[in-house]
Every structure is written in structure tokens, then in C-alpha cells.
Amino acid sequence: MNATDNTPQLMSAQDYRDSLRRCKPRVFVDGRQVDSVADERAFQPGINAVGLTYDFALQTRYAPLMTAVQHTSGRTVNRLSHLNTSSGDLLNKLEAVRLICQETGCAQRYLTHDAVNAIAQVSARIDDARGTTEHTDRFLHYLHRIQDQDLTLGVAMTDAKGDRSRRPHEQANKDSYVHVVERNAVHNGVRGIVISGTKAIVTGAPYMHELLVMPCRNMGREDADFAVCCAVPIDAPGLTIVARPAGRPGEKLEHGDALFSRKYGQSTGVCIFDRVFVPWDNVFFAGEWEHSGHLTYSYATHHRQTCIAARAGFGDLLIGAGALMCEANGFDPGRESHLREQMVELITITEGFYACGVAASVYGKADEHSKTFMPDPVFANIGKLLLATKIYDMHRIAHYVSGGLIVTLPGPDEDHNPETGARLSEVLRANPDVPYEQRIETARFIEDLTAGYQGGWYSVISLHGGGSPAAMKQEIWRNYPVGNKVELVERLLERGIAADGSAAAAPHDPARAITKNRQPGKCCDTGCTTPGQPVMVDLPTVVETLPSRLPHRESMQGLPKLL
């Protein structure tokens, strides 16, 4: 639902930073304990990135995109903690994530959105199976609180896993997976559960307000203790976070400070739960093993579609920087066919996987239990698979159009060296209309994004974030209606015979492997999207500045501000 004129009670980036000072988590980074996450230098790029999601929601220009009205409360909330109720919501979420990732590379807070939408779906599913509203009521009470307080939630999903060939209950070390160790605990007069175990990869863990603990796989009956979904404050007793720095803050390398990742980056943390108490009000399920797979599937589908937008924002950075580098080198891609081909390939890759995200929104449909909207899983997984494998081509193209200068430049200290600076500025200038300083600044920017630590980091999170390529291929095959295509050809070949003796389509055989998957609607009015359903909500003050709609020249104008 699009935002109305309700005045949002939302935090700014500074408010967010101040709120972190009120939290006292047990966090370690670089071998030492952190006194204040908000003031820890190693986390500043990550805090800056999340902070942008707060400031953009308060800007008149972006508020219609970055905020929405929560249909269960009527309150204006940040888009990244909102439950989707239409294809328009899915599209606006996609545009919002692309917008913030153009600026930050990875804004991280969008994981909150993906998790709350998945938990809403599984809560309603459990209630429908039991004929109650208990789980939905409990989750909505929690959701409204975190929306009203404008909190950012981390997703603690990926367990340490131990021996990958064994299921959770078969592990020699039970703490390889987070699990329930006590179901009837009482703490300060409040009833709840106690959990222990390890979540190995938690995005932005140190500077989250709370963690959403979720199972990372399908569970069997024997794994019931490991089937737990709950919310844990970041400074809950018994929770320890062992983190890595976000970006490259203050790092002094032989080639100088990182132009992008000194400002924006992402920390991750290993989260160790040692008998952490969770009140029942914050427990969304505990022991309902048969629903773990559905939660994992729902979250993965939401998250893979969202990742499409995040990496499209990164693609925008490479397109703009690549064009600037061509210009600085004295080339016009419009005249140089080999550069034009490379730039068009980069544009095609970026907009190609983004189009899959758009299609996943358009063909999205209401979940049968919660009635909230779910992206189409086929297009969501195809788009994520494309970006996961094409990220390396995106880097290659940036390297091709830029030239070797991006990794061979002397360090920036030489720019100010009276013995070398003036001469370097003379001999390393190419296009007479582009100052030497701008050329080398753009080169170092591209190096930071593609050829250094940060470039490798973007490659790995693109490949494995949200699940491995093998997992995406499995979901594509599982959900794609191959059976419809088989039956189409069977009909054209007149292999089926109707009761009256006329040619007919071969009957669907549930036992036949290649016709198992059948799905109407990709090309008919009775499919996933009902005719007349709003696809894109009206955003008159924003639509001309949506990240996927900006003219090329205008999109390039903002880039030097990042350098």
C-alpha cells in the first residue's frame, strides 16, 4: 500500500546512530571487545549505509517510495519493514532498494523486509493448519512495535551447520545449529524459551537493533528442537557477536584510502547464543518442524528478488563510472565500437536481471494464508541466478573500458609530492577537457569497487548471498511449468485422443516426471495477476527520479559526488 499524507514518526540517520548507543551488545572485532558500536570506527561504513535508509525516508523527494502504509495498523512505516499487499508494493520495494544501493552498494536493511514478509506468511500458515489466529496475532503485535520504533532487524538464518552430510539432530556438536534447550523457562516472572547455538553469517549484526532467528533448512520430526523462529534484542544476555569490519574504514594501503568503501560497507558477524532467554511474545514458532521448509522457501524467494535490485544499484555505479573512465581516457563509446559493445553489454546485464525482478513483481500473487504478496519464484530465482553468475562479467567490463591504470596508479600521496606531483599530472592526463585529478579519482573509484578487497567481496556476496546458484537452479526447475510446455507439444503432435475420437492434448499424468510442474497464467487472463490489478502505484513526485528510469546523462551527474 502506498504511503498517504500521514506524518511518519520515523528516525533519521542520526537518530538511528543515537539509538545504537542505547544498546549494549557484546561485540568483538579485530581481536578486541567493542565499547560502543555507534562509535566504533570499524563499523562506520555499515552504519552509514543503514543510516541512508532512514534519511531517504524523511526526504520529500523519496518518501513516497521509501515509506508505505501498513495495512494492519494504518500507520506510515519505512518501506523496508512493510508487508506487501500488491504487485505495486513489490515493484516499489524493488525501486527503493535499487535507489539506496546506488548510493551505498549494499544498504543491508532490506533483509528486514524479506524476513518479516516470510514470517507473516508462515505464521498465517500455522494458524490455518490449527484453526487459530494465535501466531499471526503474536507476530503482528511484534511487527507493529518494531515498525513504530523504526527498528532495523538482522536476519540470523545461516547456521554454522557442522558436518554438512548430517542433519541437525545428528551433529556431534549440537551448537552447530541454534536450537531450543528449554521450553518452559521463567525469567523475571515472564515465560519463554531458552536457545543455544551458532548463526555463522549475519549481515550487519553489530549495528542491528534485534535479530530475527530463523531456521536455514527444511527440518524433520527429529529436528523439532532446531525448528525455532524468534526475535532477540541485540544486547540480550548470552548473545556474543564476533564481527569483521565494514568496508575499509581508515585502511591505509599502498594505493591510498578506498574512495567508496571507506564510506559505505557491510559488516557480518558470527552470532553465538549461549542459553539466551526469549519471552513467548517474541517466539513465532518453536518445534513446528513441518513449517521450517516453508519459511526458508518464502524468505529465499523474497530475498532473491530483493537482491536483484541491490545488485542493479551496483550495476548503475559501474555503468556511470565506466562511462566517466571512457571520457577521461579520451574515448567516446558512441564512436568507439569496441567500447560501445562493452558498455551495452554491461547495461544489458544490469537491466536484464532487473527485468526479472520486475517480472517477479508483476506475476507475484497473494499468499494463500496471509494474503500478503509473494514474488513469482521463477523470475525471482532466474534474476538472482543471472546476477550471481554475471557479476564477474560486470567487473570484467569495468576493467576493459577503464584500462590497466586502475591498478597501476601510484598512491595519492604522490599527487601532493613536490618532487613528483606536477609531472604526474602532466603525463597522466588524457582528455584535455578532463582534469588529471578527475581521471585518477575515477580510476581509483573503479579499483575500489572491482579490483580490490571490496570488489572480491561484491563477487562473493553476489554469488552466494541468498543461497548458492545450485539452490536457485533447483527452485527454477521445481517451479517452472515444464509440464505445460510438454503438453503443448503433445497437443500439436496430436498424441492425445479425446473420448469422441478427436485429437486432444495428452492427459496429465501425475506420475510422469516431465509433466509434474504445471502452472497457468504466464500468458492468460486467469493467471498470477488478475486483469486490472494495479501493477505500479502512482508516485507522481518520485517516478521521474526512480533509479531505473533516470536518463543516462542525469544518472552520471551524481557520481562525482561519491568520489
Q: Residue spans of the language-model regions?
A:
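Internal helix-loop-helix
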Residues: 55-153, 204, 210
